[in-house]
């Protein structure tokens, strides 16, 4: 096994995700999912091996220096769970005055995202393959983010699994500390129950977080959010989508 192969393959590991009680209190650490071997294609592996030095960020226990990473002081937007990364790359390409960091635990998605970033020749994007809760806790400085995007997270449909949902009181509390004044939180889901849960959690932080919806709940699908592969599939199945957009005072 070559050294380059080892680098990409070591990203395929078990990722732990924090588990919370229904009222948002930290409960314990659980193994939420496993990054399975055999799904990372040779092409995706090569993209990670060959371009990680430019696009990749590794987990660290101290805050990232975004100015050093990007070479400028442009606003930084963090996206959690970018899937295959196409919409994230498109957003970065359309907004060169913003810097984007994407977190994804599945290495095929990381490899695909890097490949598309290379194709689109974007310089304002970095990717991380690690548990998002640990990145937020350890590697993102307070007040350093201009925005947080979370599109179509796992809804954990069964009631007994709702505590595994990433959007919980403690999660949003941490997001609030990481955002700069005027920074945004943008969630999207195609599960109504999860949308209502997200809304209830976000409302707990009023007036520090302001809902931009004129109706006080959800916003229309914004044109600036590219259509994801996941969303397009949902549309074909007749699924509705709920967007929430809150801004920190």
UniProtKB/Swiss-Prot annotation:
Pfam families: Methyltransf_4. The active site is at residue 154. Keywords: Methyltransferase, S-adenosyl-L-methionine, Transferase, tRNA processing. The keyword Iron does not apply. Its EC number is 2.1.1.33. Coiled coil: none annotated. Gene3D superfamilies: Vaccinia Virus protein VP39. S-adenosyl-L-methionine binds at residues 79, 104, 131, 154. Substrate binds at residues 158, 190, 228-231. One of its GO terms (molecular function) is tRNA (guanine(46)-N7)-methyltransferase activity. Belongs to the class I-like SAM-binding methyltransferase superfamily. TrmB family. This is tRNA (guanine-N(7)-)-methyltransferase. It comes from Haemophilus ducreyi (strain 35000HP / ATCC 700724).
